[in-house]
Amino acid sequence: EFPKYDSITELDVYCNQNNKSDVQMYNFITKLESEYGNITVTVYKGSKTISNDKSILNECELYFVFNIGSNKRVVCLADNKTWDQSLKYWNSSKYPYPRWCDEYLTESEFVRSIGEYKFHVNNGTVKYWEKYYNFPDMVFNYSDKKHDLRIGSLDLETYGDNCFELGLGNLNVYAGGFALNDGFKKLYYLNNDTELNSGEAIIKKMFGDLFDYIAEDRKARNNYTIYAHNLGRFDSVFIIRSLCSEGYKINGQWIDNSILYLKIVDSTRKLTIKLRDSIKLVPHSLDKALSSNGCNISKGMFPHKFVNKDTLNYIGDKPDIKYYVDENKFNESKLKKYKSLPSILNLKKECLNYLDKDILGLLELMNKVSLTYFNEYKLNITKFSTLPSITLNIFGIRFYDDQNSIKMINGPLSEFIRSSYFGGNSDIFVSGEERLVKNGYHYDMNSQYPYAMLQSMPTGNPVFSTNTDLNYYRNGFVFARVTPPSKDTLVNLFIPRRSDDGSVICDRNTFYEFIPTPDLKQGLEYGYKFEVICGINFPDACGNGELFSEFVNHFYEIKSSSTDLGQKYIAKLSLNSLYGKFGQKEREYSIRLLEKDKAKEIISKNHYSYMSEVSDNYTLIKSGGRLNSKLRRLYAEQARINTINDDLLSSKFIKSRGIPSAVQISAMISSYARTSINPFKNIPGNLAIASNTDSLILRKPLEDHLIGKEIGKWKLEHKFKNGVFVKPKLYCYEDVDINELIRKASGVTASNLTYENFVELVNGKDVLTNKELFRLNWETLNIEIVNINTKISGIKE
């Protein structure tokens, strides 16, 4: 309970002016009133001292009341012996004793501010309280003045050691090559009669030649960035294993069970090569990326599954097409390409031709991408490991207005917001015989997430509050008791919740969940009821389009109208890669290759962990990532870590500071994306059959005004017949225009399933299928491809 607003003024006025200290006090107050002009100061006498230390506060406590206008005042607690050391800080957070500010609202209501807290008091009872936070702004890289042209490419070819199964078994390197921008290129092929008698020997020779070449002109060639397509979970494994005993210093970055980049240093000659994963910047197959960017070089065709230790020097009849293309990927285009190949195969010659195309094609691709990013945005791709990271910096350098500041939130608030961060809903809304759909329409929304980015965003600092009024939360996140509507009111539910096993469902029963305000407000319109318990509000949230409209409009215009394939490709990637970066949770780790004795010593003293025993003498270790240096400095300036004392938050979130991020932006964009599709799930007379994040399957067509090329409009992907809808991401139908069976099957190879298999699943029968599985063991640095059988359980209704 709190005293009334005027309770302090009911105390006795302190008026003792019989000693020198009191005279000085009143002179100070008079001077202060004169300087400010709009304040009056009254001193009241309390009944206690403000410390048990009698040597410091040996007289009475005093309340210095600074009246500011007619409805606001600051109260500073001091005593008549030490006031002169503290009162000069009366209007500052540096004030050393209790201090608060009261704002008069009505006869019974006032707001008391104490530090970061505000208590809203009515008749002596706190209605709700708020805690105000002050987090640092998001930081971005600076643009580059000089284009870094030191770019190269690298590729390794492998075969499976299981000669009786096509392409299966443990993978072994048998060929490799690299190419640099200045024209230097070399290819290597396994030959048991030469020094290149193993995959490790090939890799050692490759990097030995590279470093020797760099040493010839160190000034021009040092610090090359060499790209490999799928470095993170493929090439890097063989490279680390092969170079561990060659005397190179190897370190890099690791995230999400994949290596982001490797830095290989020849310490003796002070030479450095950086390896980056091109698939992290260009997230498509090399074949698709080359064609999408209008590259002159196209990927060749090669019988990977025909290669084993006994066929490396094969010269003879061209193998069957199954060695070139997986059976489930056969099509007319691939068949035509296969038929155009020579009837006689010289495997070594064709491998080197194929390898040559791969490294030169990748080099052409990365040069095109590099040129576009530098010419358009003055950024060197060689500084970035991922597409989201470079897109984030494009936004920061080119489009970010710091008047709408994005805060890097950490600790309990970050975890609160992250708990409300859901992806798009994936649902099947039919059951029983309705799973067999005679006719229907499959629609996709144009640029759903960029469309969501055009809405109001949670910019500025957050405020945690126990306010239970729905209208209080303009833009934010709440923890609430949710009561869904009956099926008569709303057939297809859409407010998500996490079940005990971690899965996301839309429940018909009452539940508690963390919810963004767009979901909450839309839910109210469709019959949901909410009882808010607490939440996070962003009072300085920007208006619609103020944060991202320039970014979205810029790239959408390029995507829609540019004739430059490279720019068009980058625009499409940029539109869809930015939002998730704000909410990145995965911590980046540093990795280091060390001699075992040194590794043990470092692990015992630092936050490193064992990763792999690379050889008898060397160990690969990893350590938890550190914050960006700019962020570390910003957080160091904060006097203390913000915490929340509320029991709900303390018990669940207070244990860890978490990783600073702007997860509020990602969570809000994801919420807007969900609300953009939800209304179409319950169209009267045309209820949805199924939906995914940005797609919708209906029995009847959408109205014409909803269809178009504009952002946020719908486009018809398939008009179909004979649909079978088993469960989310497991369905099929026949496209009526191309007479092709369209199959979706998450977790298995969809093309291995027949129409009859889907019908069996709907009828409750289990279906057995198989798929090739890529297994990477980081402890042993071993890669294996295996064929496994998988059972898909039938629907039991």
From Swiss-Prot:
Example GO molecular function: DNA-directed DNA polymerase activity
Cell compartment(s), UniProt: Mitochondrion
UniProt xrefs under SMART domains: POLBc (SM00486)
Domain of life the protein comes from: Eukaryota
GO CC, any one term: mitochondrion
Swiss-Prot/TrEMBL keywords: DNA replication, DNA-binding, DNA-directed DNA polymerase, Mitochondrion, Nucleotidyltransferase, Plasmid, Transferase
Signal peptide: none
Pfam families per UniProt: DNA_pol_B_2
Entry's EC annotation: 2.7.7.7
Family classification: Belongs to the DNA polymerase type-B family.
PANTHER family associated with the record: DNA POLYMERASE (PTHR33568), DNA-DIRECTED DNA POLYMERASE (PTHR33568:SF3)
Name of the protein described by the UniProt record: Probable DNA polymerase
UniProt source species: Agaricus bitorquis
